C-alpha cells in the first residue's frame, strides 16, 4: 500500500514530546486537520489534563475512536538508537516514543476519516474522536471526566474503537473485546514488636499472616468463562521488620492485586478476603482501590465488522481476547453499546526503541476506514 499521509501525521505527532499529562498541542493539530472535513471540536480540560471531543454529524449511530496523545517517559535517552522524539525510519520500522502507544493509531484513524468523508460526504450517523492527555498517568482527569460530561447530556456511543496496540505477531491478529477488572489491596497486619529471643513477649505479624497468605494464594476465586480466564490473585509487595536481625516486627505490609473476570464482583472479592483474614484471627487494616471493572463486548456487529475489515486488508482472521492490562475502555464502556480495542503491535510499548512496522501503518488506516464504511456507508468501501 502506498498511502503515506498516515506515516507523515504519525511522525508529526511523535515529534512532539507529550510526556503525560503534557499534550504539546497534539490535540490542536488533530482539531485543525479534522475541522477541514466538518468535525466540530470541544475542548474539555481538567487540571493539567487536556481532552478533546471531536464530532462530525448529529445522528446515530455514533462511531467513536478513543485514544491518548500522552506518552510514558523515555527512560535513558542515551540507550535509544535514535532520539525518542525524532521519528526515525530504519529497518522497515518507525521508531519513536509513542510510535506504538498510540500516536500511530491516532494518525491512522484521522487519515481514515479523511478518505472516508471524501468518498461518503453524506454518510449515515456520526463519527467522533475522544482524545485525552491523561491515559499513561493517574487517569483521573482524562477519559473518565469526558465520559461524565457526555453521560450528563445523554450523548452516547454506539460503537467505540480504542486504538490501543493489540497485535501480537502481525497486524490484525488480535482484537480486545473486553478487559478484566483490577482491584488492589493495601494490607497492614498488626503485631507487637519485641526482642527475637523473647517471642512470648511479642506477636509476630509475619507468622500470624502466614496461614491466611497460604489460603489466599490457593483459593479458586472463579473458573473464568468463555471470554475471561479465571480471576487471579497476586502479591506485588510484602515488607516487614526494621532491618535488624534481632527484632520481631511490629507490623507487616502486604500489597496485592486481583485481575478479575465477569464471574466475580468487586464486593464479592472484598468479602471473601476479609472472611479469610478473620477466619485466621489476623489483626489488620485493609485499604482497597478499584481502578476498573471488567467489561465485555460479546461477539456481535462491531466485532464482525472489525474482523471483516481486517480480513479484507490483512488477509487473516482476528482472534477475540480479553488478556492484558486495563485501558480507558473501562471508562467508555459506561456510555458505549459495543467497544473493542484495535491497533498496531504491542511488542515494544513503553520500551527503549519503541517502534511499529512501516508497512502496518497504511494497513491499519485501511482497516479503520473499512470499519467506518461498514458501519456508516452500507458496507461501501
Curated annotation (Swiss-Prot):
Gene Ontology molecular function terms on file: acetylornithine deacetylase activity; cobalt ion binding; succinyl-diaminopimelate desuccinylase activity; zinc ion binding
GO biological process: diaminopimelate biosynthetic process; L-arginine biosynthetic process; lysine biosynthetic process via diaminopimelate
Reaction(s) the record says it catalyses: N-succinyl-(2S,6S)-2,6-diaminopimelate + H2O = (2S,6S)-2,6-diaminopimelate + succinate
One Pfam short name: M20_dimer
Biological pathway: Amino-acid biosynthesis; L-lysine biosynthesis via DAP pathway; LL-2,6-diaminopimelate from (S)-tetrahydrodipicolinate (succinylase route): step 3/3
Binding-site list for Zn(2+) 2: 101, 136, 350
Protein residues bound to Zn(2+) 1: 68, 101, 164
EC id: 3.5.1.18
Source superkingdom: Bacteria
Cofactor names: Zn(2+); Co(2+)
Keywords from the UniProt entry: Amino-acid biosynthesis, Cobalt, Diaminopimelate biosynthesis, Hydrolase, Lysine biosynthesis, Metal-binding, Zinc
SUPFAM superfamilies, alphabetized: Bacterial exopeptidase dimerisation domain, Zn-dependent exopeptidases
Cofactor note: Binds 2 Zn(2+) or Co(2+) ions per subunit.
Catalytic residues of the enzyme: 70, 135
UniProt record similarity statement: Belongs to the peptidase M20A family. DapE subfamily.
Quaternary state and interactors: Homodimer.
Its job: Catalyzes the hydrolysis of N-succinyl-L,L-diaminopimelic acid (SDAP), forming succinate and LL-2,6-diaminopimelate (DAP), an intermediate involved in the bacterial biosynthesis of lysine and meso-diaminopimelic acid, an essential component of bacterial cell walls.
Protein name: Succinyl-diaminopimelate desuccinylase
Species of provenance: Neisseria meningitidis serogroup B (strain ATCC BAA-335 / MC58)
Amino acid at each position: 500500500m502506498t498511502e503515506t499521509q498516515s506515516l507523515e501525521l504519525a511522525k508529526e505527532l511523535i515529534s512532539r514530546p507529550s510526556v503525560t499529562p503534557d499534550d504539546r498541542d497534539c490535540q490542536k493539530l488533530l482539531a485543525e486537520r479534522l475541522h477541514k472535513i466538518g468535525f466540530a471540536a470541544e475542548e474539555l480540560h481538567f487540571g493539567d489534563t487536556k481532552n478533546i471531543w471531536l464530532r462530525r454529524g448529529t445522528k446515530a449511530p455514533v462511531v467513536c475512536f478513543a485514544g491518548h496523545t500522552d506518552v510514558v517517559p523515555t527512560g535513558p535517552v542515551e540507550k535509544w538508537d535514535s532520539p525518542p522524539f525524532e521519528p526515525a525510519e530504519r529497518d522497515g520500522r518507525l521508531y519513536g516514543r509513542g510510535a506504538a502507544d498510540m500516536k500511530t493509531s491516532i494518525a491512522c484513524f484521522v487519515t481514515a476519516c479523511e478518505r472516508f468523508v471524501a468518498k461518503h460526504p453524506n454518510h449515515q450517523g456520526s463519527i467522533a474522536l475522544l482524545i485525552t492527555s491523561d491515559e499513561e498517568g493517574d487517569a483521573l482527569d482524562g477519559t473518565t471526566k469526558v465520559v461524565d460530561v457526555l453521560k450528563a447530556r445523554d450523548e452516547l456511543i454506539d460503537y467505540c474503537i480504542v486504538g490501543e496496540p493489540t497485535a501480537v505477531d502481525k497486524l490484525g491478529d488480535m482484537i480486545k473485546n473486553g478487559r478484566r477488572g483490577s482491584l488492589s489491596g493495601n494490607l497492614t497486619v498488626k503485631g507487637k514488636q519485641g526482642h527475637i529471643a523473647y517471642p512470648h513477649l511479642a506477636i509476630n505479624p509475619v507468622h500470624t499472616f502466614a496461614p491466611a497468605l497460604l489460603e489466599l494464594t490457593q483459593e479458586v476465586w472463579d473458573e473464568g468463562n468463555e471470554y475471561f480466564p479465571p480471576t487471579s490473585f497476586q502479591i506485588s509487595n510484602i515488607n516487614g521488620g526494621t532491618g535488624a536481625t534481632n527484632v520481631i516486627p511490629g507490623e507487616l505490609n502486604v500489597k496485592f492485586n486481583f485481575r478479575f473476570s465477569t464471574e466475580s464482583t468487586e464486593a464479592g472479592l472484598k468479602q471473601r478476603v476479609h472472611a479469610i483474614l478473620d477466619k485466621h484471627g489476623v489483626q489488620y487494616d485493609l485499604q482497597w482501590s478499584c481502578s476498573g471493572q471488567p467489561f465485555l463486548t460479546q461477539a456481535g456487529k462491531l466485532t464482525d465488522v472489525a474482523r471483516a475489515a481486517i480480513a479484507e486488508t490483512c488477509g487473516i482472521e482476528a482472534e477475540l481476547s480479553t488478556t492484558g492490562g486495563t485501558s480507558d475502555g473501562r471508562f467508555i464502556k459506561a456510555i458505549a453499546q459495543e467497544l473493542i480495542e484495535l491497533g498496531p503491535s504491542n511488542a515494544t510499548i513503553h520500551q527503549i526503541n519503541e517502534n511499529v512496522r512501516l508497512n502496518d501503518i497504511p494497513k491499519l488506516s485501511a482497516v479503520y476506514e473499512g470499519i467506518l464504511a461498514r458501519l456508516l456507508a452500507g458496507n461501501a468501501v
